[in-house]
């Protein structure tokens, strides 16, 4: 038996069969941040970015991305997502935007990939909406910070 669940005994890629797994409540939160100059962050906090409301647009993009994860990530199961929330917080200390995406479902497999996809697409949207003002922005620190439910149990890191 392979240690990698998406690789069979012959080394071929496969989609894991989750049909025999119990449906349980599952939740995952992923986080990252976009660093930028203070002047660029001011465009967000003052609502003067040329492309419009950066935080609202990034929030919607992240939600849409979570729902499309199985179309973007090979071998990722399509899931019935129960909820997606995105927190986008301007942080003058970075300076930049802190992003956290939480995804919930009840099903046989976890939602870590959906949370990671939501956070990363929200960050990409922030970059896209502000790139005319600053090309040196950086998307950093993408990681799962919390996961609950399923056979492997709970996980937490900050």
Curated annotation (Swiss-Prot):
The keyword Lyase is assigned to this record:
yes
Q: Name one GO molecular function term.
A: cyclic pyranopterin monophosphate synthase activity
> What's the domain of life for this entry?
Bacteria
A Gene Ontology biological process annotation? Mo-molybdopterin cofactor biosynthetic process
One family from Pfam that matches here is MoaC
Q: Where does substrate bind?
A: 75-77, 113-114
Active site location: 128
Sorted alphabetically, which keywords does the UniProt record give? Lyase, Molybdenum cofactor biosynthesis
Its biological purpose is as follows: Catalyzes the conversion of (8S)-3',8-cyclo-7,8-dihydroguanosine 5'-triphosphate to cyclic pyranopterin monophosphate (cPMP).
* Family affiliation: Belongs to the MoaC family.
Q: How does it assemble?
A: Homohexamer; trimer of dimers.
Write the protein's name: Cyclic pyranopterin monophosphate synthase
Organism expressing this protein natively? Acidiphilium cryptum (strain JF-5)
- What lineage does UniProt assign to this protein's organism? Bacteria, Pseudomonadati, Pseudomonadota, Alphaproteobacteria, Acetobacterales
């Amino acid at each position: 038996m392979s240690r990698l669940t998406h690789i069979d005994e012959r080394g071929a890629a496969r989609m894991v069969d989750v049909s025999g797994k119990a449906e349980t409540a599952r939740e995952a939160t992923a986080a990252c941040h976009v660093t930028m100059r203070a002047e660029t962050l001011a465009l967000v906090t003052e609502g003067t970015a040329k492309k419009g409301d950066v935080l609202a647009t990034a929030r919607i993009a992240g939600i849409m991305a979570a729902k499309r994860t199985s179309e973007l990530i090979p071998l990722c199961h399509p899931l019935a997502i129960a909820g997606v929330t995105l927190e986008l917080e301007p942080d003058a200390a970075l300076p930049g935007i802190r992003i956290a995406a939480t995804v919930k479902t009840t099903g046989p497999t976890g939602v870590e990939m959906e949370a990671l996809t939501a956070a990363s697409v929200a960050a990409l949207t922030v970059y896209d909406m502000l790139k005319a003002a600053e090309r040196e922005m950086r998307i950093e620190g993408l990681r799962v910070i919390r996961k609950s439910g399923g056979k492997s149990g709970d996980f937490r890191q900050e």
